[in-house]
């Protein structure tokens, strides 16, 4: 209601406000992750600008991001490329490539496809999109077209990792693309043979993490953004010991790729003569771990807990305080890149004026209805405001980020996660995804707790187990957004999931 908005505005405007909103409260998700979410994110910046962003008590922060951990202790994250040698599409160039020199990997194919348009590329033969360009603002508007001039259409797909069905909209499109004659050959590298691996012509069996060496830090998306430690109020780096040899004919992902590269005559270039354990040690040596623990002790213990930084001895600058006081940037992070500053290096922000712009000059250079220069509310094309659709589909589905699975990482593996009723419910021998709804909506449809229900719209349908709760308002249904294994009951793309 309007009076609630006005009350919040008065309370906000009459005292110092520290904003704990955004997609990083639990490391992923948030209001910004929607079709028009950039408008919400811009609004948050404008609200903090009116408070005086960077002044004492006036700043951004998100739950665990305020934890007193040592952000300066370096360990490479999964967005930094690992052993790939790729400095174009990973974050390796920021630190890792200098710390861990490796042979470069360059993809000479300039053609690209937006992941959410793979189905259109295969079925229609053409599509377009905009890249994610973390290096510049203007680069995000560089529209590309597929197929690119001088390039052929995609005829083969090599699917490794991830879950397209669980993380794209209208996934029936993918079922049609996989079965299309336009896609001549599909290889899938899979551990569990779930979901889309069943569409493959050739399946390369990968082993589990218990059957190979690895090294990593808990809950860190490093490389995608600097100091990206989320979900935990501590830092733990662990070595993943190889417990047993790979079962059956399975191999580790590294060994599968190495075998292919040997067939192509480039095995030595790919491996650089190193085993998986050698690469683990290379990552160890590239980090700040050698200054705290020896490789032998780390290997024996299996983990290292990074102590919280003693801020009394090494006080850290406050984020954005330099901006509020008109000083040069003194925060220990490499962004923006030197050429990204709007004015002088380390002075001001990445905008063209170096200031917070309520009407960004850069957006005036592009005619993009989804990113207007003056921020405004852009209504969704679906919802209660769309009369015709709302008449046919009177329940609004709300889909927050999953709590118990991530890109199918823990779903469909027949583990103890299935016993968590918030995740799946056992009905007649099958574990169903959960859809929560208000009891009044359920009564009107004669739905009881844990009855099977079919959620559907014009794009497709999913069979779930209903969970009745007063925590939802009437007219609203809640189910986790993604990360369920694709399991159609009939013809793929033509039957409920």
Language-model segments: what does each one mean?
Residues 42-49, 258-263, 400:
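Short, hydrophobic/amphipathic alpha-helical patches that form generic packing surfaces
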Residues 237-240, 254-261:
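Extended catalytic-interface subdomain
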Residues 31-35, 242-249:
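Active-site rim elements
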Residues 50, 99-246, 284-497:
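A cross-kingdom feature strongest in bacterial/archaeal respiratory oxidoreductases
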Residues 3, 38-45, 169, 181, ...:
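Conserved active-site and cofactor/substrate-binding residues in soluble primary-metabolism enzymes
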Residues 3-142, 214-216, 220, 368:
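A glycine-rich, hydrophobic/aromatic-adjacent loop/helix-cap motif
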Residues 6, 19-20, 53-62, 186-189, ...:
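Acidic/polar loop patches that form or flank catalytic/metal-binding clefts of enzymes
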Residues 2-4, 11-21, 53-60, 163-166, ...:
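Intrinsically disordered or highly flexible coil/loop and linker segments, enriched in small
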């Amino acid at each position: 209601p309007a009076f609630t908005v006005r009350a919040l505005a008065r309370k906000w405007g009459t005292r110092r406000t520290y904003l704990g909103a955004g997609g990083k409260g639990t490391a992923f998700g948030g209001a910004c992750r929607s079709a028009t979410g950039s408008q919400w994110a811009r609004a948050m910046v404008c609200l903090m600008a009116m408070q005086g962003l960077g002044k004492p008590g006036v700043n951004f922060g998100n739950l665990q991001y305020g934890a007193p951990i040592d952000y300066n202790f370096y360990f490479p994250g999964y967005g930094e490329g690992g052993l790939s040698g790729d400095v174009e599409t990973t974050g390796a160039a920021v630190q890792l490539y200098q710390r861990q020199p490796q042979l470069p990997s360059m993809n000479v194919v300039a053609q690209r496809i937006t992941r959410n348009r793979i189905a259109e590329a295969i079925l229609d033969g053409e599509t377009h999109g905009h890249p994610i360009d973390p290096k510049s603002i203007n680069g995000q508007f560089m529209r590309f077209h597929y197929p690119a001039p001088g390039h052929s259409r995609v005829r083969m797909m090599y699917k490794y990792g991830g879950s397209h069905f669980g993380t794209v909209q209208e996934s029936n499109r993918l079922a049609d693309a996989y079965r299309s004659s336009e896609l001549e050959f599909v290889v899938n590298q899979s551990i569990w043979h779930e979901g889309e691996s069943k569409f493959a012509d050739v399946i390369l069996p990968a082993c589990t993490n218990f059957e190979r060496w690895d090294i990593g830090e808990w809950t860190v998306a490093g490389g995608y953004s600097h100091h990206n430690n989320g979900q935990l109020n501590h830092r733990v780096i662990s070595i993943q010991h190889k417990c047993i040899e790979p079962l059956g004919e399975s191999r580790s992902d590294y060994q599968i790729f190495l075998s292919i590269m040997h067939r192509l005559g480039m095995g030595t270039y790919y491996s650089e003569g190193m085993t998986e354990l050698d690469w683990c040690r290379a990552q160890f040596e590239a980090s700040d771990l050698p200054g705290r623990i020896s490789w032998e002790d780390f290997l024996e213990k299996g983990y290292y807990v990074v102590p919280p930084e003693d801020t009394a001895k090494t006080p850290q600058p406050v984020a954005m305080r330099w901006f509020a006081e008109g000083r040069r940037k003194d925060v220990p992070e490499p962004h923006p890149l030197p050429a990204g500053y709007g004015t002088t290096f380390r002075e001001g922000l990445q905008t063209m004026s170096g200031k917070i712009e309520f009407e960004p000059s850069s957006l005036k250079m592009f005619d993009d209805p989804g990113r207007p220069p003056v921020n405004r509310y852009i209504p969704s094309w679906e919802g209660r405001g769309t009369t015709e659709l709302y008449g046919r589909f009177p329940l609004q589905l709300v889909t927050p980020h999953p709590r118990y699975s991530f890109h199918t990482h823990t779903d469909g593996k027949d583990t103890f996660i299935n016993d968590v009723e918030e995740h799946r419910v056992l009905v007649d021998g099958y574990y169903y995804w959960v859809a929560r709804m208000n009891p009044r909506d359920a009564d009107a449809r004669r739905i009881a707790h844990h009855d099977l229900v079919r959620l559907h719209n014009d794009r497709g349908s999913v069979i779930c187990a209903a969970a009745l709760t007063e925590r939802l308002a009437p007219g609203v249904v809640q189910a986790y957004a993604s990360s369920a294994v694709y399991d159609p009951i009939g013809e793929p793309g033509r039957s409920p999931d």
